Amino acid sequence: MANKPLQPISYPIFTFRWLAIHGLAIPTVFFFGAITAMQFIQR
């Protein structure tokens, strides 16, 4: 975010944030993609 070099406890927080965001965003995007596909594949 901002220029704050006095934060030595930022590495695990950023890693955990990255894991949490991607761990939730990837299945969510896949789920929305499946729902959108189902909307278009109505027989």
Swiss-Prot record:
Its main location: plastid. The chain crosses the membrane at residues 18-34. GO terms for cellular component: chloroplast thylakoid membrane; photosystem II reaction center. One of its GO terms (biological process) is photosynthetic electron transport chain. It is found in: Plastid, Chloroplast thylakoid membrane. Its cofactor is heme b. With its partner (PsbE) binds heme. PSII binds additional chlorophylls, carotenoids and specific lipids. It comes from the Eukaryota. Heme binds at H22. Keywords: Chloroplast, Electron transport, Heme, Iron, Membrane, Metal-binding, Photosynthesis, Photosystem II, Plastid, Thylakoid, Transmembrane, Transmembrane helix, Transport. It is a single-pass membrane protein. GO terms for molecular function: electron transfer activity; heme binding; iron ion binding. Belongs to the PsbE/PsbF family. This b-type cytochrome is tightly associated with the reaction center of photosystem II (PSII). PSII is a light-driven water:plastoquinone oxidoreductase that uses light energy to abstract electrons from H(2)O, generating O(2) and a proton gradient subsequently used for ATP formation. It consists of a core antenna complex that captures photons, and an electron transfer chain that converts photonic excitation into a charge separation. Heterodimer of an alpha subunit and a beta subunit. PSII is composed of 1 copy each of membrane proteins PsbA, PsbB, PsbC, PsbD, PsbE, PsbF, PsbH, PsbI, PsbJ, PsbK, PsbL, PsbM, PsbT, PsbY, PsbZ, Psb30/Ycf12, at least 3 peripheral proteins of the oxygen-evolving complex and a large number of cofactors. It forms dimeric complexes. This is Cytochrome b559 subunit beta.
